[in-house]
Amino acid sequence: MLPFLRSELARCQPYHPNPGGTGMAMDILDTNECPYDLPTDLKQTLADRYVEAIASNRYPDGSHTDLKAAIVDYLSEQTAGQWQPGPEHVTVGNGSDELIRSILIATCLGGQGSVLVAEPTFSMYGIVAETLGIPVVRIGRDPQTWEMDLAAAETAITQTEGTPVRLCFVVHPNSPTANPLTEAEKDWLRQVPPQILVVIDEAYFEFSGETLLAELPQHPNWLITRTFSKALRLAAHRVGYGIGDPQLIAALEAIRLPYNLPSVAQLAATLALEARSQLLSAIPRLITERDRLYRKLQVVSQLQVWPSASNFLFLKTQSSSQTAALAAQLKAQGTLVRHTADGLRITIGSPAENERTLAHLQTAITQSLPATV
């Protein structure tokens, strides 16, 4: 290791996207993107606005003024008049990953705190924390329901030895297991003490239809994060946003890098929100496809598959080695899935992609997995 690098970086593991590289056309079902691109008319509108509104020799709007106004309009639909969000409640990041990094810096850096996660969950929480030298406290989940071990969570936040927990990440619904928060889990979050920040990642909110946004004013130690990369079809543009107490948002705005979001990404996200009815109209079709795949896979004796409140399914075989072999065989046939947490996370694709997934799974199972009684 180079002598000027921090020694603990030797233990850090990067996020590994599926490398592909098979030389064949692939169904990309490993990153939970929407299977549908922006419609051609919206792409043309975006191109026109790029020509009209962007001077390439000028930096982007560092305050994200128009985008924040569009986000506030979107949020106002979801609060049902219970409270009125404003731009002071919103921060914007270069993907949710930048928000995660800023949150960790604001709460835990320099030995100020540790971060609590219930695994399996989104791996970037732990990855980013470790790159910053922040301790990660990992608790488990029930292997059948994927609910958090709340007793372990309570022990973690009340322990008095070592670095105190200052930050807790939860995903609603969770990735890779696709389960939404239960009422017991929500009740636990409601009583987390005010010196601990609770980040509720609602990346898949548009699919689950469940949000804790209405409760946000009662919990200044809550922050909700969301993304444009899933339901709003802008993964290529890397836009995430957070909603929280204005004092928390002001701190995150102070930490983030200047001009963090390119002008074209801001235009694309603003346009996506203007056209949200058109873009979100695909969600019922995706949910129908998700439920169809779930029913098909549920009767395969070699698989255990869980219900989903998101745009993906999570399944397991009898052993970790069988699951790894299944992922490799799917890739060899042209279907990329995410092998994680000793299971497979499969994004819901187009009907044609889903049919190929079912066929490829059947072939792989027939070849390598014994039937169970």
From Swiss-Prot:
One of its GO terms (biological process) is L-histidine biosynthetic process. NCBIfam families: PRK02610.1. It is an enzyme of class 2 (transferase). The keyword Amino-acid biosynthesis applies. It comes from Synechococcus elongatus (strain ATCC 33912 / PCC 7942 / FACHB-805) (Anacystis nidulans R2). Keywords: Amino-acid biosynthesis, Aminotransferase, Histidine biosynthesis, Pyridoxal phosphate, Transferase. GO terms for molecular function: histidinol-phosphate transaminase activity; pyridoxal phosphate binding. Its cofactor is pyridoxal 5'-phosphate. Belongs to the class-II pyridoxal-phosphate-dependent aminotransferase family. Histidinol-phosphate aminotransferase subfamily. The modification N6-(pyridoxal phosphate)lysine is found at K230. Homodimer. SUPFAM superfamilies: PLP-dependent transferases (SSF53383). This is Histidinol-phosphate aminotransferase. It comes from the Bacteria. The gene is hisC. It catalyses: L-histidinol phosphate + 2-oxoglutarate = 3-(imidazol-4-yl)-2-oxopropyl phosphate + L-glutamate. It holds the Pfam family Aminotran_1_2. Coiled coil: none annotated.
